[in-house]
A protein has these predicted regions:
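Juxtamembrane segments of multi-pass membrane proteins
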Residues: 52-55, 63-70
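Acidic, Ser/Thr-rich low-complexity segments on the non-lumenal side of membrane proteins
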Residues: 15-58
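Short, glycine/proline-biased beta-turn/loop segments that scaffold the active-site neighborhood
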Residues: 72-74
Length: 180
C-alpha cells in the first residue's frame, strides 16, 4: 500500500462519476483536465513505480503509465516527447508525438491503443508516491473517445452490441450465462 495512506486515510478505488451535465463528456485536450489532475502530472518524480507494477506494460501492451503522465505534462507545456529518457510505449517509438494545451490528445500526443491497453486495475495509482490518479485520467480520455467521437476498440464495440442484444457483455442468453 501507499506510504501516504496513513496521512490522508485510505484512497478510494472508485472512478470519479461522469458529469452528464457537462458541455463535453470526457477529456479531449490537456487543457480539459481539472487543475488538480494537471498538478499531479507536474508532480511526477519519474520514479517508475507505476511502470514496474503495470500488467499491461509487463505484457508488452502499448502502455507505460509513467510515460503517459509525462506526455500529459508535455501536452500542457507544448512540445514533443523527444526529451523522454525512460522506457516508451512498447511498439511505439519515442519522438512521434507533439502536444499543446489546446490540441487533441489522441492521436497527436497519445495513440488511442495506448489508452485502451489499460486494464484499470489501479496498480499504478496504489504505487504512486505522489498520489497521481493515472486511471482517472485514462478513463476521462476514453470517455471522450467513446461518448463524443463514438470510437471504441473492436472488442469494446462487440461487448456493447452484446449488451444491447442480450443484456450481458458476453452475448449469452440468460439461460446459458453460467455454462462456461
Amino acid at each position: 500500500t501507499n506510504t501516504h495512506d496513513a496521512h490522508r486515510g485510505s484512497r478510494s478505488t472508485a472512478l470519479f462519476p461522469l458529469d452528464l451535465t457537462a458541455p463535453k463528456l470526457g477529456v479531449e485536450k490537456p487543457a480539459d483536465f481539472q487543475w488538480n489532475q494537471l498538478l499531479g502530472f507536474d508532480a511526477c518524480v519519474q520514479c517508475g513505480r507505476c511502470q514496474a507494477v503495470c500488467p499491461a506494460f509487463a505484457a508488452g501492451q502499448p502502455l507505460n503509465p509513467k510515460k503517459l503522465i509525462q506526455d500529459m505534462g508535455v501536452g500542457m507545456a507544448g512540445g514533443s516527447d523527444t526529451g523522454y529518457a525512460g522506457a516508451g510505449y512498447p511498439g511505439i517509438e519515442i519522438g512521434r508525438h507533439q502536444g499543446a494545451p489546446e490540441q487533441a490528445i489522441v492521436p497527436q500526443l497519445v495513440e488511442a491503443e495506448t489508452l485502451w491497453a489499460c486494464t484499470t486495475c489501479r496498480a499504478c495509482v496504489e504505487e504512486c508516491p505522489m498520489l497521481i490518479e493515472h486511471v482517472d485520467a485514462i478513463v476521462d480520455m476514453r470517455r471522450f473517445l467513446t461518448l463524443e467521437r463514438g470510437e471504441t476498440p473492436e472488442k469494446g464495440a462487440v461487448a456493447i452490441d452484446n449488451l444491447i442484444a442480450t443484456d450481458n457483455p458476453g452475448g449469452l442468453d440468460n439461460a446459458s450465462r453460467l455454462d462456461w
